[in-house]
Amino acid sequence: MRQTKTGILLANLGTPDAPTPEAVKRYLKQFLSDRRVVDTSRLLWWPLLRSVILPLRSPRVAKLYASVWMEGGSPLMVYSRQQQQALAQRLPETPVALGMSYGSPSLESAVDELLAEHVDHIVVLPLYPQYSCSTVGAVWDELARILARKRSIPGISFIRDYADNHDYINALANSVRASFAKHGEPDLLLLSYHGIPQRYADEGDDYPQRCRTTTRELASALEMAPEKVMMTFQSRFGREPWLMPYTDETLKMLGEKGVGHIQVMCPGFAADCLETLEEIAEQNREVFLGAGGKKYEYIPALNATPEHIEMMANLVAAYR
């Protein structure tokens, strides 16, 4: 019987190559052109994207990226590379590649990197703990397009999500406990997930249920009363309704009601990025404090912490 050689493909969203309007425009064009992300009629969407959204948003978003840019690139790229390298060290006999749905390194370059290592089985781990058609579904689509162009394709194991994975929940819980020990236990732990249009959920995307699963399991692991944990959704885009309650509006309401101390975690992000470091850690902090809140801390993503890497190793082990 022929022995199988397995490789691991870590997949994430992607990032601009530089904090410049030109680089951000290239990235946003690719991202916002994906039907998994925006499924509006192309006849309506293309003119709006090209003539309004990209020209107006690219310079503003570039300034935000510049405010969090690190020596090795964007935070998402830096932490994703650290994850790749740490997992490769943890699994020295297994090639590990990193691919992004948008920007570089692309998913295609990651597949080619693994095939050059003569693997005949690839375990694909999209680093989105909660499935959504707009994230995990986009990875699946691109992977199918890539493999459709290959004469010989490897076996594929595709991890749909890990919203209730025991190691993942424990890693989150330990991160929360460390934050409580450092800053004191807050009046409320707010778990903020990236939003999706409500229409997507109505049409069958089980993302909100997967977010609720993570929230329930994490609250249970922390032995926190239900009223001490709240789930919200951030980063809505466009005019149609998105999943509610909205994070920014909730923080404003809580500050106005006299809630003094809040800590915020984003369990749906495997690595810190512009969204967590700027929108959640900075913008939403100002919203809460401006509404009367007294103390606000953001709990970082798991990034390349040893516990997170061990979780990844255990997760892919079942498919190797």
Swiss-Prot record:
Disulfide feature: none
Annotated EC: 4.98.1.1
CDD domains xref list: Ferrochelatase_C (cd00419), Ferrochelatase_N (cd03411)
Native source organism of the sequence: Escherichia coli O1:K1 / APEC
Compartment(s) where it occurs, according to its Swiss-Prot or TrEMBL record: Cytoplasm
Domain of life, per lineage: Bacteria
Catalytic activity: heme b + 2 H(+) = protoporphyrin IX + Fe(2+)
Alphabetically ordered keywords of this record: Cytoplasm, Heme biosynthesis, Iron, Lyase, Metal-binding, Porphyrin biosynthesis
Identification of the protein by name: Ferrochelatase
Binding site for Fe cation: H194, E275
Subunit structure of this chain's protein: Monomer.
Major localization class: cytoplasm
Function of the molecule: Catalyzes the ferrous insertion into protoporphyrin IX.
Organism lineage: Bacteria, Pseudomonadati, Pseudomonadota, Gammaproteobacteria, Enterobacterales
Gene: hemH
SUPFAM superfamilies reported in the protein's UniProt record: Chelatase
One annotated Gene Ontology cellular component of this protein: cytoplasm
Family: Belongs to the ferrochelatase family.
GO MF entry, a single one: ferrochelatase activity
Pathway: Porphyrin-containing compound metabolism; protoheme biosynthesis; protoheme from protoporphyrin-IX: step 1/1
Keyword set includes Secreted: no
